[in-house]
A protein has these predicted regions:
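Short aromatic-glycine-(Arg/Gly/Cys) micro-motifs in beta-strand/loop hairpins
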Residues: 31-57
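Intrinsically disordered, low-complexity, charge-dense segments enriched in Lys/Arg
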Residues: 3-4, 8, 81-137
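Short secondary-structure junctions and interdomain/linker hinges
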Residues: 18-25, 79, 106, 125
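Residues that form generic nucleotide/phosphate-binding pockets
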Residues: 14, 18, 71, 117
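Generic structural signal for short, solvent-exposed loop/turn connectors between secondary structure elements
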Residues: 25-27, 32-34, 63-66, 80-93
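Aromatic- and glycine-enriched beta-alpha-beta binding-site module
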Residues: 47-51, 55-80
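N-terminal "first-domain core" detector
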Residues: 1-39
Length: 137
């Protein structure tokens, strides 16, 4: 086995664990498609969280294994909570609570990322809807 295989296998184990904890079907690491989410370790050892729609790259986030696990978990939590909770303040609070069960660092990161998104898209007033994480946003 190569280092890349070891890294892919370790990532698959963690994706499976998170999926089970979230109550969703796991996804295969390394299976690349041109329509949907792709999680893979590239030949250079970099970890990718990429999304394709109809053959066109929507995004390709590159980071550590922890980054990939955070993106995977946060995306699932955000999607699932949005389906169940209409009130945005309650939605952001529930996202924080669920992510905290996996990692308090991920929960805080999600709040910081959401605040940055609000600023980027000209909605800084929406930061007030986010839970207090004990640090300035």
């Amino acid at each position: 086995m190569t280092d890349l295989d070891d890294k892919s296998n370790a990532l698959q184990i963690e994706i499976d664990r998170l999926s089970e904890g979230l109550g969703v079907r796991s996804m295969p690491v390394g299976l690349r498609t041109n329509d949907g989410l792709n999680i893979f370790v590239a030949d250079d050892g970099s970890c990718h969280y990429a999304f394709y729609e109809r053959g066109k790259l929507g995004f390709d986030r590159v980071g550590s294994i922890d980054d990939l696990l955070y993106w995977y978990c946060a995306d699932i939590v955000t999607d699932e909570v949005a389906k169940r909770v209409g009130d945005r303040t309650e939605r952001f609070k529930l996202e924080y609570e669920i992510l905290s069960q996996f990692s308090t660092d991920w929960a805080k990161r999600n709040v910081r990322d959401t605040a940055a998104m609000f600023r980027k898209y000209g909605k800084p007033q929406d930061i007030a809807l986010l839970p207090d994480i004990g640090e300035p946003l």
